Amino acid sequence: MINYPLASSTWDDLEYKAIQSVLDSKMFTMGEYVKQYETQFAKTFGSKYAVMVSSGSTANLLMIAALFFTKKPRLKKGDEIIVPAVSWSTTYYPLQQYGLRVKFVDIDINTLNIDIESLKEAVTDSTKAILTVNLLGNPNNFDEINKIIGGRDIILLEDNCESMGATFNNKCAGTFGLMGTFSSFYSHHIATMEGGCIVTDDEEIYHILLCIRAHGWTRNLPKKNKVTGVKSDDQFEESFKFVLPGYNVRPLEMSGAIGIEQLKKLPRFISVRRKNAEYFLDKFKDHPYLDVQQETGESSWFGFSFIIKKDSGVIRKQLVENLNSAGIECRPIVTGNFLKNTDVLKYFDYTVHNNVDNAEYLDKNGLFVGNHQIELFDEIDYLREVLK
C-alpha cells in the first residue's frame, strides 16, 4: 500500500539554517527578515507592496479592515459585497465583523470558482465590492469579471490563499484586485510555519495595513505617510502613538527568514505541481463516475478535486472510506457550501442570489486529494487503481 498524504514538507537544510540564524540573532519579533521577505514577495508577484501577517485568515481580516480606514472610506457598514458560496470560513468572517451585507452567489461546478453568469445577474447598483476566491489553485476568469464591473465603482478583491503561483493571461493571481491575500500555512504552496501576506499597488492602503497590523500605532509607518501625513521626530512619543483601531497580527521573524528561502524554490514547486496535474488529468480523463476541476488560466494546482457524476449511483461516504482504507488522505472541497453553517450565519447580514445548486451538489458529492511539490506519478497511478 502506498501512503498518499494531503501535503508534505517543503523544507530542507536551508530553512533550518534560516531559523537558526534568527535564533542566533536574538531578534525574534518582526524585523529585517520580514522586511526582506515582503520586498521579495512583492517582486515575485508583480505588486508594489506586500505586508506579511500571521496567517491567510488575518490577511483577509486586514484586507477588509483597511477599506474602512482610507481618508475617503472605500466601504462602510451595510455596504453589499458579493462572494462565492464555496470558500474557507475566514473568507467570510471579516465581512460580518465589519458589518457588510454579504450576497452569496453560486459556483461553476466545473471550475469551482464563482459562476460568471450568476455573478453578472447578482451585481446591482447596491454592489460595492466583489471578493473573488481562487479555489484550489485555480484563478478566476478576470477578463469576464472586469467586463461585469465595467466602469462602475465596484472594488475587486481576491482571496488567493489557495492559489499562490497561479496566473491568468500571464498575470499573477492575487494581483487583479485592489488587494489580494496569500497563505503560507504548512499544506500550501510554500510554508513559513504559519503566515500570510497582502499585496496591493495602492500606497494609502499599504500604509493603513502597516498601521493596523501592529496595534494601530505609527511606529512602522514611513516618516511621510498617507495615514498621519508627517511623523514627529520625537521617537519617544511617536513610537507609542495610536491612530487606527488595529490588531497584533505580526509574523515572527523566523517566518520571514523561512519565507525568503521558500520563495526561491517556488518556481520549481509550481513546475512540479503542474507536471503532477498534467499526469493526473491524463489518468482521470473520461472517468466513469468522477469529474475533475476544469482549469482557468494556469492553475497552481493546490490539490486534485473530484465531483461525483450525477446519476452514477456512487456514494461519497463509501468513496471516502475506500480512500482512507487505501492510505489516501482526502478532504471536503474547502468547507463545501458555506451556507449550510446556520449556527454561524445567524450573525451575518446576508442574502443569497437565486439558488446555490452547484455549491449544494459539491457539498454532498465533492472531495479532494493532495498535490505536492514532489513528483507524484506513482501515487496518482495508485489513486487511479483505487478509484476504478
Curated annotation (Swiss-Prot):
Homodimer. Its main location: membrane. Signal peptide: none annotated. Its EC number is 4.2.1.168. Involved in the biosynthesis of L-colitose, a 3,6-dideoxyhexose present in the O-antigen region of lipopolysaccharides (LPS), where it serves as an antigenic determinant and is vital for bacterial defense and survival. Catalyzes the removal of the C3'-hydroxyl group from GDP-4-keto-6-deoxy-D-mannose via a combined transamination-deoxygenation reaction. The catalysis is initiated by a transamination step in which pyridoxal 5'-phosphate (PLP) is converted to pyridoxamine 5'-phosphate (PMP) in the presence of L-glutamate. GO terms for biological process: polysaccharide biosynthetic process. GO terms for cellular component: plasma membrane. InterPro entries: DegT/StrS_aminotransferase, PyrdxlP-dep_Trfase, PyrdxlP-dep_Trfase_major, PyrdxlP-dep_Trfase_small. It catalyses: GDP-4-dehydro-alpha-D-rhamnose + L-glutamate = GDP-4-dehydro-3,6-dideoxy-alpha-D-mannose + 2-oxoglutarate + NH4(+). This is GDP-4-keto-6-deoxy-D-mannose 3-dehydratase. It is found in: Cell membrane. It is a single-pass membrane protein. Pyridoxal 5'-phosphate binds at residues 56-57, 88, 162, 183, 248. Pathway: Nucleotide-sugar metabolism; GDP-L-colitose biosynthesis. Belongs to the DegT/DnrJ/EryC1 family. The gene is colD. The active site is at residue 188. Keywords: Cell membrane, Lyase, Membrane, Pyridoxal phosphate, Transmembrane, Transmembrane helix. The chain crosses the membrane at residues 49-69. L-glutamate binds at residues 215, 250. GO terms for molecular function: lyase activity; pyridoxal phosphate binding; transaminase activity. Its cofactor is pyridoxal 5'-phosphate. Pfam families: DegT_DnrJ_EryC1. GDP-4-dehydro-alpha-D-rhamnose binds at residues 26-29, 219, 329.
